[in-house]
Amino acid sequence: MTRVEDFFSKQIDFCKRKKKIYLAIVASVLLVAAVIGVVAGVKSHSKNSDDHADIMAISSSAHAIVKSACSNTLHPELCYSAIVNVSDFSKKVTSQKDVIELSLNITVKAVRRNYYAVKELIKTRKGLTPREKVALHDCLETMDETLDELHTAVEDLELYPNKKSLKEHVEDLKTLISSAITNQETCLDGFSHDEADKKVRKVLLKGQKHVEKMCSNALAMICNMTDTDIANEMKLSAPANNRKLVEDNGEWPEWLSAGDRRLLQSSTVTPDVVVAADGSGDYKTVSEAVRKAPEKSSKRYVIRIKAGVYRENVDVPKKKTNIMFMGDGKSNTIITASRNVQDGSTTFHSATVVRVAGKVLARDITFQNTAGASKHQAVALCVGSDLSAFYRCDMLAYQDTLYVHSNRQFFVQCLVAGTVDFIFGNGAAVFQDCDIHARRPGSGQKNMVTAQGRTDPNQNTGIVIQKCRIGATSDLRPVQKSFPTYLGRPWKEYSRTVIMQSSITDVIQPAGWHEWNGNFALDTLFYGEYANTGAGAPTSGRVKWKGHKVITSSTEAQAYTPGRFIAGGSWLSSTGFPFSLGL
């Protein structure tokens, strides 16, 4: 019994010892686990803290970049809030270029919203007048143009500054966004004819102005970024221009295609198609020839328009690029129509010929609107085509003859005749060696040669009249004292017009320029005159506005030559038309 008791007693002692050891081991394990947990927790907390610090640093840096980029815009609060309200914007912004790109993408969405709002308005608003319906369709067209321009600008920015020369990048980007701003104004301008129009305008105003401000901000940031980059480039390298111009040494530019070189070298251009009203060509109307022309053509497509009077409205849509209209002489080939505001059109839609597609050329043709002075706005030619040029063409109408709507344009050896605001719009347009004649207007009217429509100080737009002849037609000359004629008036706030090296007859009033409405734009416009001659050229009696300037420096005047103002050195040779790049 004792052994048994001893045995069990030992067994019990052994079990107790084993249990103690087991508990000790468990305790040790738990202690180690606890320590590991604490260490891991500390490390995790440290990592999370580091990650949070990194995120905060990135966010802070992105905010600083956005603030800096937006500080030079006209609407900095809108610029900043639009960007920082984008989800994860801090991950998308590492440079000023990123801010611009993001801003443009936001603007694209805003334009789309406006587009669908207009479509809905057309469907649902009762009692729209015929002109209001036309104006709303004008809005859809200009919004569509804006979307294309913004998308192209984004693509250009993604490759900036490596796709092409820095200067070309700069001019292209400024032109695209300047045109986008103009399009918003054009939409609203269609609703400015009567009180009913203005009610519809009020519905569209907020959305259109929002897009315009967003585009304005993008343009300001582009100007700031590119000005800095150009300054840096000039420090690093001496100015050089490897592109040789025909004007300089008789050689063709290296970027001109072989096909276009052959076309320009030929004394007689072989057309791709012929338009003849008498049925002797491929088509009877110009419109039909345009419809059948290839889209997005990379080579020149020549449409010869034989002698005749073509009574039609012609629209060259944006996809019909590189079209050239070649007439049989401006006295022989005439395209004419008579749409006008008085009969229910908008100014934009009244044009006999409208050109939107890029690189459209015309020579030896008359564009005419025969509506007459009593019908008010009636456009003969509306040009929104970038890198477009006109040679030996006549533009004949009364009020609003030539609408230089948007983009870069060049007119050489042309005649423009009209009455009120007969060269108007917001393109970057240069007239060289042209005749610009005021006609006899309606009773009580004054003639205004120009009405330039720049709305933003950063737009690269304006009207330049260089080496031209400004005078009067035969019907005005005998009665010109009864109908005062002026060089221009400010259609929009930052209106810009320069008259230089031109002959001006006494048809122009000594004051030279006329106000639009009281003091509107007199301080913000820029009206320059340089080295003009003739009885109407003296500047001593000119208006004393802050925005008027007599230019005395040839260096300053150079800024308004084709080579500088419309980057003519990179494209005018490809037209085959005569031109001078400088003074």
From Swiss-Prot:
Purpose of the protein: Acts in the modification of cell walls via demethylesterification of cell wall pectin.
Disulphide connectivity of cysteines: C414-C434
Misc: The PMEI region may act as an autoinhibitory domain and prevent untimely PME activity during transport.
Active site: D400 (proton donor), D421 (nucleophile)
Binding site for substrate: T347, Q377, R489, W491
Chief location category: secreted
Cell inner membrane among keywords: no
Cellular localisation: Secreted, Cell wall
Native species: Solanum lycopersicum
SMART domains referenced in this protein's UniProt entry, alphabetically: PMEI
GO cellular component term, pick one: extracellular region
Region (Pectinesterase U1): 272-570
UniProt protein name: Pectinesterase/pectinesterase inhibitor U1
Pfam families from the UniProt entry: Pectinesterase, PMEI
GO biological process: cell wall modification; pectin catabolic process
Similarity section: In the N-terminal section; belongs to the PMEI family. In the C-terminal section; belongs to the pectinesterase family.
Region (Pectinesterase inhibitor U1): 60-221
Marked site: Transition state stabilizer: Q399
Name of the gene encoding the protein in the UniProt record: PMEU1
GO MF terms held by the record: pectinesterase activity; pectinesterase inhibitor activity
Glycan-modified residues: N85, N105, N224
Primary enzyme class: hydrolase
Reaction(s) this enzyme catalyzes, per UniProt: [(1->4)-alpha-D-galacturonosyl methyl ester](n) + n H2O = [(1->4)-alpha-D-galacturonosyl](n) + n methanol + n H(+)
Key words, A-Z: Aspartyl esterase, Cell wall, Cell wall biogenesis/degradation, Disulfide bond, Glycoprotein, Hydrolase, Secreted, Signal
